[in-house]
């Protein structure tokens, strides 16, 4: 079912894990005339949901740990082979085991000759436990708490070794750590027993010297040299050329590498960007800085370490009424926030001044090119030697040495130094970055694509660093191309990007917190409203609550007249009105900050004027003065006060600002589609990114209710609204609102009126895209039989029922990935695995009551068990609080952890089968049919890693060794991955939904409704047994949720 003759607008609603889409047909004037198709695409967000961390972070850390362990093991292997070649140790010695008093032997080696096996044990112990070695002088100035604790421990122990009490780290460990604390090694989370590797090297050299003096024949120079190399070798940090390979090239100068963030030019670019973009709101008017103000500020960040908004206010001599645009005044002491901080500039200055090189700094500060070289060197290179080599012959050695003690830079920007040096002179003149780019390069985003294509090309990953955004845009591209294949090229594309898209996890949490605060305030207002109007028959509507909130914000006064508002008459028709202070027809501003509660009698003649115009602010009338005093004395936010006191408005600029989403993601996608995708609309610009507030307004005025929590269909609802927000629709709404503002009584009495400009008849009803719009949209989005219902409910709109009408089916992106974590991190003892039991050591600070009940030897140590139980009860079963102070047995021995038993029916054997870890995730489930019954074979990541294709199917409530073998009598049907679409028929029920996962204990699978409808199953999820199912099929579904086909039988695929 394809068509290429359709003229349509494609509407998209993009979220962090969803793409809602709608195809809306338009006429020759590009007015929306009908809904052709609609749908939703759901996918997993590209981050860890609970923490917002990158999905790759845990794998990267685990990989780093594995490499560290592998390098240590390889180092020990090299040492053992060398000691065997030198005749110090034999294979038998290594098999039988070396002496385990290595710490004592290291001290004894200073006093007597060690035997060959003792000497070998000492050398291997030093190679294995070789402390920490820093490659940078300034590493102690880190913000990393863990690294700071490690360096503190290293420094403290180094200081102790400078005294005459301890000759070597081993002697310090025995005489101090073991004696005073009862242990030598670091305990959980502590680094107080960590040594500097250079101190261990000194111990190694001293041991060789002493053993040579005692006549040990295994102290030859080449042995000492080789052991020293093993002790001190460290993989070089990624530096210089290696970083450049990963760095990427400039947005504009394609052959140039990106510039370091801490170069002078990069910091100057950031400063000029902030300076030239700074906007001040005063008397409601918005303005940029003039040249005199720019010159007042331009050198200030170089003179002081930070420039705050409060300092900017003082330097510019701004009035109390003036505020800074985009600064959140809801926070306490908002203007104490930093406006600009030149971190690299002041870091270099302080480093030189602290070493007595103030004059040198004053000379260097006049040389931007040298400062660029310094910023580049300390960002690219990670060892003192490499940095010194790069800067030699560029800056004096005294400067290099001073900087090495203090500087540690990283991070790069998207522009190169070559590009910056072209752009900065124009920005010095006050031009914005985009203006400078257009003048130099002809385009803001780099070289523009001169040729569009019918399908949208892949999203350039190098330009979108945020993985969450990149996944959303990539999924949106798939949807766009699928729609184009079905319906041909669109005339226009309208895109709404969710407020959270492009925000960091922290910012999204702040938005969520703000929304929760707003919800709390609304709920409080609802409660107060109900208490005040106890005879109110129904639940208060949003408009009722809005009136009440505005009443409280305005101290119960009409802002236009200053008269008291009788709170008991708030619900009385015709008594008060909610007015757009700045007329909606001129601004399209429907925000809370543009709404005031006024007496209806005072609002009759305002029309579509601003308060400044209506109250004759131009001549500073008494009415205007009273209005200003009432606004300034209200509880309105600073931004709202500015809005209400606006004196001059540029209608086109206001409308453009309030209609269009100007955030980076919206701008990027808009430009990318405009430049790369063939659009057949008649306008020059056929991509529109509406502001989310406008979408919410239209959705509300068109009577479309968005229930986010119930299911995923609401994304489609927004996409339809976005598609219908055409320029012509905006004009119709503007004319209607203007008519309503000027002639409110005619709207109330449902009179029609002729627009004097266009001659068009203005309906007394809020404009809709087409007749029966609300009913048709609700049927298409929410009804499972739209064709039938459309015929029954909308007989007067037969064109609503066409060949493309079908139930909305949410498409979900399946997860085919088979790599990942092999097993869970915790390793348990496997000694009793044959009994189905593993033993785990649990720190007391994590000992919950249920774990205590499974304590090993509970019957043999009743006093210990009773003591632990009593301590937990004393602190309300909170182990962290209960064992914050040490716990001792009756004999005085401290207990830090206990062993507990756990049921272990399966797992992964590790550490030469001495340990067992729980399985990680099931990445694939293979479905078989045998004797007319269905069987499920789970495949885990560790099996994929080892190339094992398991053949045992789950038997409910049985151990894995009792599972059923899928032999020649079993037939493979298909493989299931998360979010695969399946159809399941049992004797009693029918399921058609997405596969979520498998319960290996019961053999049941979990299925989710395609739209996530929470009223079905248990929160939208069904748990179903498949063994006795009548039929079980897997389906393939396209990105649009339209083409759903049974997967054809295929051979079982290997895991690797």
Curated annotation (Swiss-Prot):
EC number, as in UniProt: 3.1.-.-
Record: residues binding Mg(2+) 2: 13, 500, 715
CDD domains to which the protein is assigned, alphabetical: Csn1
Active site residues per record: 13, 580
Superkingdom of origin organism: Bacteria
Function per UniProt: CRISPR (clustered regularly interspaced short palindromic repeat) is an adaptive immune system that provides protection against mobile genetic elements (viruses, transposable elements and conjugative plasmids). CRISPR clusters contain spacers, sequences complementary to antecedent mobile elements, and target invading nucleic acids. CRISPR clusters are transcribed and processed into CRISPR RNA (crRNA). In type II CRISPR systems correct processing of pre-crRNA requires a trans-encoded small RNA (tracrRNA), endogenous ribonuclease 3 (rnc) and this protein.
One family name in Pfam for this protein: HNH_4
Name of the protein in its database record: CRISPR-associated endonuclease Cas9
Natural source organism: Pasteurella multocida (strain Pm70)
Family of the protein in this entry: Belongs to the CRISPR-associated protein Cas9 family. Subtype II-C subfamily.
Gene name for this UniProt entry: cas9
One of the GO biological process terms: defense response to virus
